[in-house]
């Protein structure tokens, strides 16, 4: 038993070293605005329902890591859709810096064309096929994986491909809605390094403590109260503990 465990640990260590050699160093196409986005006194409700939030205001600084948390149904994903312009606030407005470029990861994995291969889904003219396959390697797609039809991928594989795709957009503001939902802890840790090192602003909805710690969150927005505070692990853990039944 001991020998088997030692062999497994040795294999994992070797694999981690292999992954670390191909981590990405992709940068945004341009530096973002000093203030990429301001949410100004917004209220939002779906038709004939109570407002999800009233008079919510905040602004985000360039390269900030901003975390949104709350129980199910309080409007976390809705707030992201308001920021993206997919929904309009009932009152108030959202302002964008003139250098703000946005890329969005949806937990529904809607970014992917299921009729294309893995490689075709991330095809960018600025990269050669060899470069693209190296990039795919940093998201744990190897060799013939590049030619798999996206429709046959598992949810975890689709999530990895979607995360790869949004990084290749080279936007200076990444909006991530539960990016680790389909990932096992080891995969999340490896892929999370690509976001930890990204030289842009990140707004993320997540309850994955390991991922949150990994990408160095600066501030925390708690819904539905709208309370904003500087991030600490203790504050997040206290909030998560308060939501347990």
Q: Where are the language model's segments positioned?
A:
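ABC ATP-binding cassette signature C-motif
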Residues: 31-245
């Amino acid at each position: 038993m001991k020998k088997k465990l030692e062999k497994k640990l040795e294999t994992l260590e070797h694999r981690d070293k292999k992954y670390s050699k191909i981590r990405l160093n992709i940068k945004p196409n341009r530096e973002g605005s000093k203030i990429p986005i301001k949410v100004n006194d917004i209220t939002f409700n779906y038709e004939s329902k109570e407002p999800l939030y009233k008079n919510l205001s905040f602004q985000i600084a360039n390269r900030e890591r901003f975390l949104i948390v709350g129980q199910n149904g309080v409007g976390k994903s809705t707030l992201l859709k308001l920021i993206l312009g997919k929904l309009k606030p009932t009152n108030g407005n959202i302002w964008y810096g003139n250098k703000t470029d946005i890329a969005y990861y949806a937990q529904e994995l809607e970014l992917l064309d299921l009729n294309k291969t893995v490689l075709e889904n991330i095809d960018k003219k600025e990269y050669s096929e060899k470069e693209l396959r190296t990039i795919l390697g940093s998201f744990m797609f190897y060799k013939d994986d590049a030619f798999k039809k996206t429709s046959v991928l598992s949810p975890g594989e689709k999530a990895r491909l979607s995360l790869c795709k949004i990084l290749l957009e080279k936007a200076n503001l990444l909006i991530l809605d539960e990016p680790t939902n389909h990932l096992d802890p080891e995969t999340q840790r490896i892929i999370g390094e690509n976001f930890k090192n990204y030289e842009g602003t990140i707004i993320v909805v997540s309850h994955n403590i390991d991922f949150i710690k990994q990408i160095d969150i600066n501030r925390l927005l708690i819904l539905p109260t709208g309370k904003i505070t500087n991030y600490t692990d203790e504050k997040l853990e206290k909030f998560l503990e308060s939501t347990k039944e």
